[in-house]
Amino acid sequence: ARVFRDRTLGVLDALVGATTLTFAALISSPERDEESLRLVVEVADTIGQEIAHCVREFVEQAPMLGDEERLGLLRDFYGRVGKTLDALGSTGIAAVVHEVVEALALCADVDPRAVFLQVARVVEHGRRGGYECDDLAKDAIVRLVQRYLADHRALLQDESACRAALISILDIFVRAGWAEARLLTYNLEQIFR
């Protein structure tokens, strides 16, 4: 089973690599081929949906496992797809960025610091595609920030990189006009209580 999984993840990495390179070439071309661009966006979106679906399905079935076993399997998964999620998120395609953020949020307990910094990078890339203007984005980011304020407060207190990432994420959504992001920003002093 491990060999099959490793081969599958290798194919996924190759597909994501080809997709992101093709997307970058199409987006920067002065004579943009809109049909090819649409197809590449569709492929990237499908990949993002499938990865997020796999993580959600695993988390839903995880209660049958012990905490250590569940966390170990999720850690293994994140270790294998973390860079793939970065590559997908770097496209800036709003729908793809959303799926990547959703998948990363489910991996937060594996490595809270790395996941949070990765979310911040992906959200920054998402600005190119208008991710911050999407209602689903707002809900996902508000949930994630609230979770980090509740479960990983010490990380935000002690790690300047994580605080900077938090401020960057909230700033993006405040500038987009989201009242929820503004409210979270006003309540940031609770991090230091």
What are these model-derived regions, one by one?
Residues 1-193:
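Non-catalytic all-alpha helical scaffold/repeat segments
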